[in-house]
Amino acid sequence: VWPRGIECQMYQAHLGRVFPIRGATLEGGEMIHDASNPPGQWNTFEVYSEEGRVATVLNGKLVGLASNADPRIGHIALESEGVPTQFRNIRIKRFSPTHHLRDAPGPDRR
């Protein structure tokens, strides 16, 4: 069962892409570039979300940017789709706006 929401892709070939699933909507979200480490090495993956803007940062580099995301609130889920996946040092915390989200397009930036 796939919930309606915003997905931040962790599949190796598309790491960092942001896209809507099950009726959710957003603008943008394409993967900007590949910043992933080779298979077998750990990656650091950060997701920032504020007021409908979503930014993904992989190994310290901005790799995905979306705006006007709907829904803006909901559950956070981690999943592995058919391949072994390991997670470590998972943190969820509030933050003050970062430069990643200031760069995101939005209705107030058109």
Predicted regions and their residues:
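Carbohydrate-interacting regions of secretory-pathway proteins
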Residues: 1-110
